[in-house]
A protein has these predicted regions:
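Phosphopantetheine-dependent thiolation modules in NRPS/PKS and related acyl-activating systems
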Residues: 1-45, 50-189
Length: 189
């Protein structure tokens, strides 16, 4: 699904949830700047999952990464380490690298996760794992119960991967292919 289509559909979800015009929803705006509060974010999340047939992660990418890396590697005393900055810049391609110079408070990171374009990229990444067609007969797939989709023709069912599972996979890949080689080079130097 093209990013522009995802943006348009997500803008409609946000506009409907916040009772605003869709034109007010721009890529760089934060949902809180549009008036979203915690209950609105829950409603937006649920509607996004329903309309896109995806399951958003419950934890932030940083929380997931701390589970893989362990404590103290990505953040210390409430601030990102250099490795934490590298990981987030890699995961948030729209983030301005200048915002990650100097001391970066973990608490201040929330604004990136509330930006519309961050949501759109996250949705795009999850939609990539939602099959449109059945692997058995190439007929369209339709949402079923819970984390499942069902073929409209042959009835074959699949279980969708959760956003949590996909985040863990991405972090593990980053850890194995980017962090470990970098950390090993630093130790041997």
């Amino acid at each position: 699904m093209p990013e522009s289509e995802i943006f348009d559909r997500f803008a409609q979800i946000v506009a409907h949830s916040l009772r605003i015009e869709a034109a007010q929803v721009t890529p760089e705006i934060e949902l809180t700047d549009l008036g979203a509060e915690s209950l609105d974010l829950i409603e937006i999340s649920m509607e996004t999952e329903s309309q896109f047939h995806i399951f958003l992660p419950d934890k932030s990418i940083l929380e997931t990464a701390v589970e893989v890396f362990g404590s103290g590697i990505l953040e210390k005393e409430g601030y990102l380490t250099d490795e934490g900055k590298r990981l987030l810049l890699r995961r948030l391609p729209d983030a301005d690298a200048q915002d990650f110079e100097g001391a970066v408070s973990v608490k201040d990171l929330q604004r990136y996760f509330l930006k519309v374009n961050t949501w759109v990229r996250m949705i795009q990444g999850l939609v990539r794992y939602t099959p449109a067609k059945c692997a058995d007969c190439a007929s369209p797939m339709a949402a079923s119960m819970g984390f499942r989709m069902k073929c409209t023709h042959c009835g074959a069912e699949i279980t969708l991967r959760s956003g949590e599972e996909l985040n863990r996979e991405w972090v593990r890949e980053y850890y194995d292919h980017e962090y470990l080689p970098h950390a090993g080079a630093a130790v041997s130097a």
